[in-house]
């Protein structure tokens, strides 16, 4: 007997939509200069949950995009990088790309590869710059 996981897609899509809405609200209310550790943990958990579900269903663009976001959020919550407004703006932009990817997967379409590549490159630059200790504002 083979399990058809497509029957669980709608549940994943609904949960991912809720997690993205929660992530957006937390990011919009985040005090960049002194972020609440609980808020950072909640934002990280939202990204982590979306990534896990996306990987389970084989939504590779969503998995890959969320993985990079998650790694930056993990470093932020572990005090391994200092958040900047540019980072939070990039996280919000990523949330929009993830929302678009969900819409595409829900419609059985492939997500916009160029949009994913653009946001992933931006996140990777932020990740590299924060690892090097250079100001994130230099990325603009």
Language-model segment annotations:
Residues 1-140:
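Non-catalytic helical tethers at domain boundaries
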């Amino acid at each position: 007997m083979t399990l058809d996981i497509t029957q669980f897609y709608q549940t994943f899509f609904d949960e991912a939509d809720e997690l993205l809405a929660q992530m957006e609200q937390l990011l919009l209310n985040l005090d960049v200069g002194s972020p609440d550790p609980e808020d950072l943990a909640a934002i990280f958990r939202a990204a982590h949950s979306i990534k896990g579900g996306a990987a389970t269903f084989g939504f590779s663009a969503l998995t890959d995009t969320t993985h990079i976001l998650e790694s930056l959020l993990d470093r932020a919550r572990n005090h391994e990088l200092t958040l900047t407004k540019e980072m939070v703006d990039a996280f919000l932009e990523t949330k929009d790309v993830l929302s678009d990817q969900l819409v595409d997967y829900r419609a059985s379409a492939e997500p916009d590869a160029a949009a994913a590549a653009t946001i992933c490159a931006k996140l990777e630059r932020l990740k590299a710059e924060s690892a090097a200790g250079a100001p994130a504002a230099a990325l603009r």
